């Protein structure tokens, strides 16, 4: 019985000493966080999409608080979040232009010629390295295997009739779809763009039209 009591006392004392040690070390190595950084982080949406160019919302908040990034750096939050962060930082925020992703290809299954019927893994990066880069005759257009769909954290892009189509209402212009497209067909453009180029082929006119009826 005495052995159990001694063991309990030893464990308790050890725990107490470790607690005191950790408390002292915590105070000694404590790094004070800028209150502005905390306030800015509270206003950011928390998607951690990386569309701002930083690793996540924590990194962006730190950069904004340090003056290394503008108050309107978050593409997801847009103008409302930029205004709140600007107030925290005591700076005037310029007008934020809403952006959206855009797929530079209109060659869906009805318009683009198919060389063969494909059945297999649905991944654009993998298919881009095989001969002809997929089933479509055009080697520049959207393959339609959905790598961009998987990358989008906002469910803002879908494969419709063989090509990627962006839902502008849901798109936050984070750029993740841009990064994963092996043919670099997706770009970020102003939401209210009046003119777009819906073809990315570098072939000559006759070859373009023989592969896709809406090629240019």
Regions from the language model: what does each represent?
Residues 2-216:
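Ferredoxin-type iron-sulfur electron-transfer modules and their immediate structural context
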